[in-house]
């Protein structure tokens, strides 16, 4: 039985993950907590401070307020009938995925909803945040696809021909 759902939100203005969590909370009757993990001293802000750009730290705080405000607006419009809250937590070392898993333990959440995300092409050694959350918790994890990750539009002609060729190919299994 799911009584409490934790949804991880970020700076992406697409609210599809948050709306998926709202639908799940409404379906199960659970309360919903949206969490934004904020790195209070990101490397890019510290690099800016070194060169006299002190607005970087203020920009981090403004970004935090913007995400929290966006969550509250979505809650007011789409989740007016369920118990919700939006919180921000500091990163406190480690990765964002590990912090979300720890926060789910602190709240005793029954399910964590995260976005599918995408792997970095430049930092190939880093895992997707959704993979880290799933590995670092024993709680149920729902990986929700964002709008840009969905494949609602029809595939191209070449992809369609390739799929037909794969489907019509005979299957051969080697037996020992």
Question: Whereabouts are the PLM-identified features?
Answer:
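Small/aliphatic-rich secondary-structure junction motif
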Residues: 1-53, 136, 163-176
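Conserved beta-strand segments of the P-loop GTPase G domain that flank and frequently precede/overlap
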Residues: 7-9, 35-37, 87, 114-115, ...
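Structural beta-alpha unit
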Residues: 13, 75-112, 131, 148-151, ...
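Short, well-ordered secondary-structure micro-motifs
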Residues: 17-18, 44-47, 94-98, 124-125, ...
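Short beta-alpha junction loops
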Residues: 38-41, 117-119, 146-149
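A short acidic, glycine-rich active-site loop
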Residues: 52-69
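Glycine-rich, Arg-bearing micro-motifs that act as flexible, cationic patches
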Residues: 111-135, 150-152
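Short, flexible loop segments at boundaries between secondary-structure elements
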Residues: 139-154
């Amino acid at each position: 039985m799911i009584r409490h759902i934790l949804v991880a939100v970020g700076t992406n203005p697409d609210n599809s993950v948050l709306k998926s969590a709202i639908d799940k909370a409404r379906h199960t009757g659970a309360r919903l907590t949206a969490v934004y993990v904020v790195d209070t001293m990101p490397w890019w802000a510290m690099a800016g401070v070194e060169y006299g750009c002190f607005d970087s730290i203020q920009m981090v705080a403004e970004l935090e307020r913007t995400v929290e405000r966006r969550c509250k607006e979505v809650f007011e419009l789409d989740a007016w009938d369920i118990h919700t809250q939006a919180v921000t937590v500091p990163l406190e070392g480690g990765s964002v995925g590990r912090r979300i898993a720890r926060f789910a333990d602190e709240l005793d959440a029954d399910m964590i909803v995260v976005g599918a995300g995408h792997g970095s092409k430049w930092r190939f050694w880093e895992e997707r945040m959704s993979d880290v959350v799933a590995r670092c918790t024993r709680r149920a994890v729902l990986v929700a696809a964002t709008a840009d990750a969905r494949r609602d539009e029809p595939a191209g002609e070449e992809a369609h021909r390739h799929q037909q060729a794969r489907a019509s190919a005979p299957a051969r299994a080697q037996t020992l």
